[in-house]
Amino acid sequence: MSEMLLFEALREGLQEEMDRDPKVLVMGEDVGHYGGSYKVTKGFAEKYGDLRLLDTPIAENSFTGMAIGAAMTGLRPVVEGMNMGFLLLAFNQIANNAGMLHYTSGANFTIPIVIRGPGGVGRQLGAEHSQRLESYFQSVPGLQLVACSTPINAKGLIKSSIRSENPVILFEHVLLYNLKETIPDNEYLVCLEKAEIVRPGTDITILTYSRMRHHVLQATKSLVYKGYDPEIIDIVSLKPVDLGTISTSIKKTHKVLIVEECMRTGGIGASLRATIMEHLFDFLDAPIMCLSSQDVPTPYSGPLEELTVIQPAQIVQAVEQLCNNGNN
């Protein structure tokens, strides 16, 4: 067992897969000799060489397309976006090629590509560097979306993503890279389709992912002190969602709170709420509540930025409201 920061866990997982499979390669801006914008690939260029660590121009559409072509030939490329917001420039390649080529080629091609990088609301990074792209990509057929939230699941998810035959987008939150946790020494994988029960409980099901997992855990300290017993589930797989784990929890608690950093309109929470209403309506004792970021560009101002994102106090208030209303 050894303590690692989240970015170090990603590095170790990626390195293990590159050692295991010579078909795995990495491409992106500054991933080579600079070691990546957050040092996930530090030291890789010296170990694996320039053919497996490809420094690219600032041309996201081009190098993402190049990676998709490499995947079609049997390689397993890992594309790092210096910031996830810049992957909007590669949306055509990701949507029309990565997501759909397996189908449109009559299953003649598989696209085992991983697209990963930092995103989410940081600390005064401005609107363009504070994007949450999960809502953009969730409607693209053929893509699998996962979000890491701890060093342990970050390492396991990147390994499983690389081994998948499907195109996977791995969302990493910029404020979680320095999160520290003890990592098992033995090799392990994290299932791409399985949610994690972070805390069992009986009063309410709280569904969350990425950075908001930690906001929920912070709020839970106050909730437990006040006598509430929330069940916390990190959904991990944003698409497809693990409806089995979610169903079991809701049939026990009968109340649901969704907490996300994604935008309210068209976000992961909106899709999740629709799925729950379709499949589990009869088990609900109260309306589903969804706490999401405001539908505004993220301000540069620190105090204004904080107001756009859900805070622990709002989670406490929402749980109190749902539990009290549901018990009336």
Curated annotation (Swiss-Prot):
Binding site for thiamine diphosphate: 60
UniProt enzyme class: oxidoreductase
Stored SMART domains: Transket_pyr
A cellular component annotation (GO) from this entry: chloroplast
Superkingdom of the source species: Eukaryota
Location of this chain's protein in the cell: Plastid, Chloroplast
Required co-factors: thiamine diphosphate
Keywords: Chloroplast, Metal-binding, Oxidoreductase, Plastid, Potassium, Pyruvate, Thiamine pyrophosphate
Sites where the protein binds K(+): 113, 162, 166
Reaction(s) this enzyme catalyzes, per UniProt: N(6)-[(R)-lipoyl]-L-lysyl-[protein] + pyruvate + H(+) = N(6)-[(R)-S(8)-acetyldihydrolipoyl]-L-lysyl-[protein] + CO2
A single GO molecular function term of this UniProt record: metal ion binding
Location, primary (coarse class): plastid
EC number: 1.2.4.1
Pfam families assigned to the protein according to its UniProt record, in alphabetical order: Transket_pyr, Transketolase_C
PANTHER family the record matches: PYRUVATE DEHYDROGENASE E1 COMPONENT BETA SUBUNIT, PYRUVATE DEHYDROGENASE E1 COMPONENT SUBUNIT BETA
Summary of the function given for this chain in its UniProt record: The pyruvate dehydrogenase complex catalyzes the overall conversion of pyruvate to acetyl-CoA and CO(2). It contains multiple copies of three enzymatic components: pyruvate dehydrogenase (E1), dihydrolipoamide acetyltransferase (E2) and lipoamide dehydrogenase (E3).
Self-association and partners: Heterodimer of an alpha and a beta chain.
Name listed for the protein in its UniProt record: Pyruvate dehydrogenase E1 component subunit beta
Native organism: Staurastrum punctulatum (Green alga)
Gene symbol of the encoding locus: pdhB
